[in-house]
Amino acid sequence: MYAIIETGGKQIKVVEGQEIYVEKVTADVNESVTFDKVLFIGGDDVKVGAPLIDGATVTAKVEKHGRQKKIDVHKFKPKKNYHRKQGHRQPYTKLVIDKINA
């Protein structure tokens, strides 16, 4: 059985036991997180939400928090001696999917 959930403005296909990386979730390490925005449940019994499935949840355990690799943003205007450099590291959360409740 698999499910498609929405978190951090993205839709992610998840299976029980899978490790996923999502936008930062405000929960401590080893804490359980519940996602109630379930869009689709597939497998033997298929359920499609319009847009969400009522009563369906996905629970996951927070394994770690971190920051992605640094990206550099450069701004440049020709002939004006204008150069700007800025870096950014996006925070993420690593989750392990525990259970899909249909």
Curated annotation (Swiss-Prot):
Subunit record text: Part of the 50S ribosomal subunit. Contacts protein L20.
Function: This protein binds to 23S rRNA in the presence of protein L20.
Keyword Ribonucleoprotein carried by entry: yes
Biological processes per GO annotation: translation
InterPro entries (UniProt xref): bL21-like, bL21-like_sf, Ribosomal_bL21, Ribosomal_bL21_CS
Name of the coding gene: rplU
PANTHER family cross-referenced by the UniProt entry: 50S RIBOSOMAL PROTEIN L21 (PTHR21349), LARGE RIBOSOMAL SUBUNIT PROTEIN BL21M (PTHR21349:SF0)
Name of this chain's protein: Large ribosomal subunit protein bL21
